[in-house]
Amino acid sequence: MENSIGLGLIHGLMYGIVPVAPWFVALKRYLLEGKEKGQLAVAGTIAGQVTLLALTFFGWSRVLWVWYYFEPALIILGTMAVVRCALDCWVEQESSLRTAALGPGAGQLASKQEGLYYFLMSFGLMFCNPLHLEGSQTLLSSIPGNRYVYLLAFTVSYTAIIFIFWVTLGYRIFGKAYSGFGAQQTLNRYRIRRVSVGIVAALFLQFANCTPEALVIYHWDSLLAYTPFDGLKHHRTRGYTWEPSSDNAFELSRQSYRATNRAGVSFEQGAKRAVQFKPFWNTETRFDECNQVRERELSNEDWNAEATFHEFQGINQGVLRARSVPFNLYMVPNWEKQEDKNYLLTLRQIRDEMDDKLMAESSPQERFLVSPFTDNLDYEVDYQVYPELMAEKAQTKTAYADMVKLIRGTKWTSNHVHLGDGTDVEMSYAKLHALPAEVRLPWHYPVVKPTEVVVQTSSTDTPDSVQLLNDELQENLHFFSNEPERIQQNVYKRLWEHRTFGKVTPRMIDDKVQKRLDDRVNMRREAYVSSNPTKAK
């Protein structure tokens, strides 16, 4: 599960605690401006919170980009509004939005436009008061390992926080008068100052780690790393680099485990002492903190074993991205959208193995029954899947292209003489299907069934027994068909001795064979006449 539970709890607390200050602002409006305006403020806060949650939960990243572009300015505006509300509660002054003195009929809305204004003010304050930059950057640079565990932890943490706020504030504001403030709720100085203290405490928690460096440098770094502006600046993100060793020897470089999959398995990593972490501003630092389990330094054997499993046997990034689309809880950087060439090569290898089933996995004698006119061509090699075989079969790419042209451009025919019908059937090798524009999962490809080979003889039969059986069959055929050799030659003997395929056509018989056949016919006629003298007459 790696860091899924921790990230779920942190994100749940972040989304739950983010509207702390807006909740206090809604309470302030309820106390100083009336129940109806307080209810609109609470409704706007809830609507803003649900909207922000939906933007991230359903992966509407491009809408979040617009919010992230102006986040520093929104933080400043939200802070000014919350501080003003805290001062109003502390000194018991009338709010700048207050239109009438409290009393009978106080707090009533003058028009629908005014009610919409109160609702939108609380709705916008929800986006102007994030957990400074800590919330958005934690959301951007944290990737859960198990989405189900992550969502479970996120839901538990988030629901608990929201339930507490609703039970303590929202329910009472929408229900009866808040009993904690009594009948004179707007005139109790001590009670109202509690709201001011709560607002200041919420601001202190949210801006505890906020510095000018975080508002400027870190935000600019994340802006270039996670949004469409990443093409404006050449930068390194999410990884570490291999530095040259002390003796200036050449060392291999690897930035992240994702880049490792595209580059292939490394056979030599170099000494661990040559590894130096160089975080690039805030992006790589947060990635190292949140994904230390993923960024491990192992020995060459262990690392190659893990990389080999991940690349050839385990789930790859293409499938992982397809599974996590509905729960895209982080902005997808540019490198996530690139084509994974290794993934396409894996699909091609799967397709090649499926096509190879067309050539039966059997003995050469059995395969010969369904193969083309040559028994030396066992299978066709895809050199893109198996490039190491090119040196054995074709010395150059030109020779390889000629081989492919020959195989693809030749129509193979096979006749079913062994079945006795002598019918020509056109056949060819299966070709790799073009990959679709959007590759989903490997098992979406159609299954190619292997060719069914009919074995004519038992594996326990010997050549002598087969030949003896063939002689007996020929004698029976000679007797029942009267003169079989006038029609065709001995088919079974021809297959056994010569292994030649082709249509069986009538042929002329020489004089010696003709004389022998005539003698046999006369002998049978004389034997028949001598045994049946009456019928002969």
Swiss-Prot record:
Topology relative to the membrane: Multi-pass membrane protein
Subcellular compartments: Plastid, Chloroplast membrane
Transmembrane segments: 5-25, 40-60, 63-83, 115-135, 149-169, 197-217
Keyword Chloroplast appears in the UniProt entry: yes
Keyword terms: Chloroplast, Membrane, Plastid, Transmembrane, Transmembrane helix
One Gene Ontology cellular component annotation held by this UniProt entry: chloroplast membrane
Domain of life where this protein originates: Eukaryota
Coarse class of the protein's main subcellular location: plastid
Protein name as it appears in the record: Uncharacterized membrane protein OtCpg00060
Originating organism: Ostreococcus tauri
